[in-house]
């Protein structure tokens, strides 16, 4: 089993509140891993530690064998949605992605347009983001996460604001990405409804992570 992400004894507190309580888990490469749990259960904090945005109090995080905070500061070739993307409302969806792509020389116009098309926003790419619905902004965030064609995707609540059809289309996109070798970690309140999508489902509860489903 090749590990995409490995966390060892991951512990994080804020003041007297211990949010992560010594989590150890391996997320296998090339699979879709669902993490469910209520608000405040620790899902987002774990994702931020994996992405290098938060430093754990104890423990370690490895992404494809490289230790975060020691070998590298942030995971390489990784697309992520950890918080609501801060898109500029007065320019179009395409212009927002083009602006963000300037930070990465690997992303050109072809990658931007392909990402927009894959999330079903092609007809709205010239529309100002301020006129987007919540679901459209969520899909634009997913387009941002995939436009580098990443090896790893980390997505916190990627189905927020999506209607049933939109969620289905996004799920189909995730399956397509997995088939091409992308590892996906996604958090939601209840991913048990998507057993068909996820290869494994873990539950985060009171700072502990437990596997509840595995194909």
Question: Residue spans of the language-model regions?
Answer:
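The feature captures the beta-strand-to-loop junction immediately N-terminal to the Walker
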Residues: 36-38
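Conserved ABC ATPase "signature" region
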Residues: 98, 109-124
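H-loop/switch region of ABC-family ATPase nucleotide-binding domains
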Residues: 188-189
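Catalytic Walker B motif of ABC-type/P-loop ATPase nucleotide-binding domains
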Residues: 153-156
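Helix-to-loop junction immediately C-terminal to a conserved catalytic motif
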Residues: 51
